[in-house]
């Protein structure tokens, strides 16, 4: 009798692709307007000076300058872009 037992179905074997989140421009890096600084879910980093936030919480530069991450006493980390003119004055 040439019978073959039915194979069981596996309940594993699924995974979602990585979403490529995280910091794209680190502290001290030069950015131009529109450059993405960080992609995130929720506000892991908050927008500071010259930084905008998209509908998906993406942080982006509004002006040309240097990226700066700063932790405040309230426990939040703010990301700012210091304009080039401001850096020359320092």
UniProtKB/Swiss-Prot annotation:
Similarity-based family: Belongs to the bacterial ribosomal protein bL27 family.
Keyword annotations from UniProtKB, A to Z: Ribonucleoprotein, Ribosomal protein
Name of one Pfam family that matches: Ribosomal_L27
Protein's recorded name: Large ribosomal subunit protein bL27
Organism for this UniProt entry: Rhodopseudomonas palustris (strain TIE-1)
Entry annotated with the keyword Ribonucleoprotein: yes
Listed GO MF terms: structural constituent of ribosome
Gene Ontology biological process terms, A to Z: translation
Classification via Gene3D superfamilies: 2.40.50.100
PANTHER family xrefs: LARGE RIBOSOMAL SUBUNIT PROTEIN BL27M, RIBOSOMAL PROTEIN L27
InterPro entries with a match to the protein in the record: Ribosomal_bL27 (IPR001684), Ribosomal_bL27_CS (IPR018261)
Region of interest called Disordered, as start-end residue ranges on this chain: 1-20
Lineage: Bacteria, Pseudomonadati, Pseudomonadota, Alphaproteobacteria, Hyphomicrobiales
Keyword Nucleotide-binding found: no
Segment forming the signal sequence: none
